[in-house]
């Protein structure tokens, strides 16, 4: 348990289903709100939660197992590395994964799990 912050990228995601939270998004948030506290929980608001219940809109496809056509926002490698440097405790996002839908390497998972970030 710790302090929580919300980084809102709904505007960027509205026009780009494959948008990824960037390091610039994080530093912009910090310019307005101050440094992300260590051991905090970072919540990323993409606006994708409004599509919950509609597989095609939420995932980009409604065909089970069709991973080639997944499209939803996530967190970039650079953003994950910056969050790890900030020593956050945990991360949450309103999409199906912290990696964006079209990922093939799941690098965001690798970076954050490697830093023991839940």
Put a short name on every predicted segment.
Residues 1-118:
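Active-/binding-site microenvironments in catalytic and ligand-binding cores
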